[in-house]
Curated annotation (Swiss-Prot):
Belongs to the bacterial ribosomal protein bL19 family. Pfam families: Ribosomal_L19. One of its GO terms (molecular function) is structural constituent of ribosome. This is Large ribosomal subunit protein bL19. The gene is rplS. This protein is located at the 30S-50S ribosomal subunit interface and may play a role in the structure and function of the aminoacyl-tRNA binding site. HAMAP family: Ribosomal_bL19. One of its GO terms (cellular component) is cytosolic large ribosomal subunit. InterPro entries: Ribosomal_bL19 (IPR001857), Ribosomal_bL19_CS (IPR018257), Ribosomal_bL19_sf (IPR038657), Translation_prot_SH3-like_sf (IPR008991). NCBIfam families: rplS_bact.
Length: 114
C-alpha cells in the first residue's frame, strides 16, 4: 500500500521548483479562475514557514498590503502555482519566522545574503 501511494505521488511532484528557505523573498505566480477565465495573480512577500514533505509540503508567504499583514499558505506541488521566483535570499537563524508578525517597519527587515 505504501509503495502504491509513493508511486502515485511521484508523478504529481513538481521538478522545476527553485530552492528557497524561510527568510527569502518570493514572487509566486498563482493561477486564479474567475468564471470561465483564468488569469495569473502575483503574490510577493517573505517566506515565514516551510513545512511537511513530499506531496503535502507547504510554505507560507507574508506581505504587508496597505498597512495590513497578509499571509498566504501554498502547497508546493499544486498545479495552481504557475511559477515561483526568488527575488532575495535572506539570512535568518530560525526555521519559523512567526516573530515577524509583531514587528513593523525597519525592524521587520531581513538581512540579505550576498
Amino acid at each position: 500500500m505504501q509503495q502504491l501511494i509513493a508511486e502515485i505521488t511521484k508523478g504529481q511532484l513538481k521538478t522545476d521548483l527553485p530552492s528557497f528557505r524561510p527568510g527569502d523573498t518570493l514572487r509566486v505566480h498563482v493561477k486564479v479562475v474567475e468564471g470561465t477565465r483564468e488569469r495569473i495573480q502575483l503574490f510577493e512577500g517573505v517566506v515565514i514557514k516551510r513545512r511537511g514533505g513530499g506531496i503535502s509540503e507547504t510554505f507560507t508567504v507574508r506581505k504587508i498590503s496597505y498597512g495590513v499583514g497578509v499571509e498566504r499558505t501554498f502547497p508546493v506541488h499544486t498545479p495552481r502555482i504557475a511559477k515561483i521566483e526568488v527575488l532575495r535570499r535572506g539570512k535568518v537563524r530560525r526555521a519559523k519566522l512567526y516573530y515577524l508578525r509583531n514587528l513593523r517597519g525597519k525592524k521587520a527587515r531581513i538581512k540579505e545574503i550576498r
